[in-house]
C-alpha cells in the first residue's frame, strides 16, 4: 500500500478561502495537494502531473466544474473525481453523474466526509492497480 504522502489530490475552487481550507485538511492528513482557482489552471497542472483524486467546485469562472470533468474524462477515465458545490438539484446531480463524477458533496462538507472520500478513492485505485500502470 502506498503511503498517504505519496498520494496527490487536486482541489479546484475559485474561492481562495475554500482552497486554503481544503489544502490544509488534506495536507494535515498527509496528502500532497495541488490547487487551482479555475478549470484552465487545473488542466495545465494535469498536463504535467498525474493526479488520480480530484475535488472540483461546480461553479467556476469560465469553464464550469461539470465541463472540466468532461475534459478530464476525455483524456483519462481512471481518476476519481468528486464534485463540491454550494448548490444541489436533482438535475445537477444527474449532470454530475453523466460527466463522470464519483459523488457530489454539498457545502459545507464535514471534514470527516472529505477525508473518508479521499481514503476510499485511494483504496479503490490500489485495488485497480494493474501491471505497468501506476495509478497512484
Where do the model's predicted regions map?
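C-terminal output helix
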Residues: 109-118
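Acidic catalytic/metal-coordinating carboxylates
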Residues: 37-38, 64-67
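Short amphipathic alpha-helix used as the core "switch/output" element in two-component signaling
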Residues: 44, 66-77
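The feature encodes the CheY-like receiver
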Residues: 19, 61, 89
Amino acid at each position: 500500500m502506498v503511503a498517504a504522502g505519496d498520494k496527490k489530490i487536486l482541489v479546484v475552487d475559485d474561492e481562495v478561502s475554500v482552497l486554503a481550507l481544503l489544502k490544509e485538511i488534506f495536507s494535515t492528513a498527509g496528502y500532497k495537494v495541488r490547487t487551482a482557482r479555475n478549470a484552465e489552471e487545473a488542466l495545465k497542472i494535469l498536463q504535467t502531473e498525474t493526479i488520480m483524486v480530484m475535488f472540483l467546485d461546480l461553479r467556476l469562472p469560465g469553464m464550469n466544474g461539470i465541463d472540466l470533468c468532461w475534459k478530464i474524462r476525455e483524456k483519462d477515465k481512471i481518476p476519481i473525481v468528486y464534485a463540491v458545490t454550494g448548490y444541489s438539484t436533482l438535475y445537477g446531480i444527474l449532470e454530475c453523474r453523466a460527466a463522470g463524477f464519483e459523488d457530489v458533496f454539498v457545502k459545507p462538507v464535514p471534514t470527516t466526509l472529505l477525508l473518508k472520500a479521499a481514503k476510499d478513492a485511494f483504496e479503490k485505485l490500489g485495488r485497480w492497480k494493474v501491471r505497468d500502470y501506476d495509478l497512484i
